[in-house]
Amino acid sequence: MALSFSIYTIFSLVLSVIAWKIFYNRHLHPLSCYPGPFIWTVSRVPYAAYYAQGKLHRRVQLLHDQYGDVVRVAPDELSYRNQQAWKDIHGHSRNFPKDMRFYHISKNKAPSVLVAPDGVHRRQKRAILRAFSEPAQKSHECLLHPFVDTLIHKLQQKVEDNNSVVDITEWYNYVMFDFMALELFGESLGCLEDGVYHPWVDMLFGSIKAWAFLSQSKYFPTISWMIKIAGLLFYSDLLQHRTTKFDSIAARVPGDVESDLDQPTFTTYIKARNDPQSILSREEILSNHSFMMMAGSETTATLLSGCTFYILKHPEVHKELSCLIRNRFSSPLEITFSSLADISYLRAVLQEALRMYPPLPLGMPRVVPSGGAIVSGQFVPEKTSVAIASWATYQSSSNFKDPQSFLPERWLDMGPGDNDIKDAMQPFSVGPRACPGKMLAFAEASLILARLIWAFDLELSPQCSNWADQRAYIIWDKGPLLIKLKAPS
């Protein structure tokens, strides 16, 4: 009798605590004045569940359509989808630190430029910015051209062998991962030559879902051990493989500035010691190389994949772009960063592809600093997690006319997007932590896309007509994008 009474008492206390927590979160919490569905405002479980399933970006879009430009998506988190939020959260005059529950620290515990504290970030970014100077841009182009030549040659062989249907997503990844490996580690991964992913790249894509699952443990500290154990049970082989690959990367980071290559690389510029205020330790270089290997390759390959899909879904865009490129260039040797820079329609196509298929469709959360802050015209208390939902923002009719339509012309002067709020789209972020690789990413994507369109007529496989309807785990979980290649007509 005493035992059953004790169990009943404990059970009642637990229920009382849960009931009080629900009541507090809904009615007394500092964010209780912000709109959101009941279950999301009292518990983080719905957010975590949709995130782990890869469906968060679409669910948050629907919540914004229902509740407006700001939605409470968890007891302590707000989601935004307007232009002002970019300035208020990420602007130069702001000091909203990263929400470290969302991010990961490198295995060697040295923070990369993505997550480093402000002082460390400034020092690291000074070093990294050297790799994006105008002279550096020319070096990067010289290193990229041979990979693009190999890509075109390999695809031409496919056409000659009557094997003209290819998964272009894979080939874009081959190019970009090989290129970034050369830039960062001094040697290619050999993906293009072998026509298969290097084991390290395979591991990266295979671990997307594991990261999504395990990252949620930080949001549930009382049961984080259970989540981690479950993750180890389901993903133990993958996590061990990841550790092995990180160690192999560490062994490949060059120890000296000198390189056997004719052109300076990212590593050359980053390790140059002409500024004593921007010297990186070997551990910091390793962390940043690991980060940039993904950030500098997967995102550009994703942009190219999304752009190719939407071009081929819209024959009028494909025709216009093909005519522009083939009429302008009589030889592929003429297609360079500089010769493509003033083709405004090509830039507009890439911009619209970024809007329709942003490489990072989810928000990257920050934390409101001590004392609170005004975000999008409303006071937000300190310690609140805030993020701009990229997918929801770019697909909102309050920011873009006909947001579900692929309209490159909206980015041209006097086009149908004159009344669009274009500053609501910031795929490279804004402020002191904005991605410094914006111009290089556009140049790389322009070059690869232009060379492909110059060399081939392209046709989308019917089975890929809904290719962009994908799940997202920080990045997209892309399926095969099958296209048919033909010699240009």
Protein language model features and the residues they cover:
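C-terminal helix/juxtamembrane-tail motif
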Residues: M1-F5, I474-S489
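N-terminal membrane-proximal hinge/A-helix region immediately C-terminal to the signal-anchor transmembrane segment
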Residues: A2-R123, H145-K154, V175, A210, ...
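Cytochrome P450 I-helix active-site segment
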Residues: I39, E141, H145, V196-G206, ...
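Cytochrome P450 heme-thiolate monooxygenase catalytic core
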Residues: P97-K107, S139-T302, E320
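Cytochrome P450 heme-thiolate "Cys pocket" and heme-binding signature region
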Residues: R130, S290, A295, F337-S338, ...
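Short, small-residue alpha-helix embedded
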Residues: T299-L312, I448
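Cytochrome P450 heme-binding "Cys pocket" and the immediately downstream C-terminal segment
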Residues: P315-H318, K438-I475
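Conserved cytochrome P450 K-helix/beta-meander segment immediately N-terminal to the heme-binding cysteine loop
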Residues: I388-P416
